[in-house]
């Protein structure tokens, strides 16, 4: 197998390995939409710290990375009464969690995977769609 680009999948062939865009996601690491207990570090300011559920929002194509992008969940959102576009209500039944909460899509964080605790649930597709919309708003995408 020679080196080159496979136009059909956007893959790059290096020797006998296929790398780059279009790879199938590996079977290791958390998946997009999974909820893990995360020990959010104290970075100062008005961001969540300590152990909270967090939704994995990075693409599954980065599952082999040593880092992960998560959005924190909280059951106490002070801005909830104003219903800002970056705050997504998550019902317990939508996530497999013991109580309702809020995804704080204005606070996505890239963290080392060692800060991830056990898997606590998974967002259903409808809840993940709402998180995607809120992330687009918060990040200007």
Regions inferred by a protein language model and the residue ranges of each:
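Conserved functional hotspots at enzyme active or ligand-binding sites that engage polyanionic ligands
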Residues: 1-141
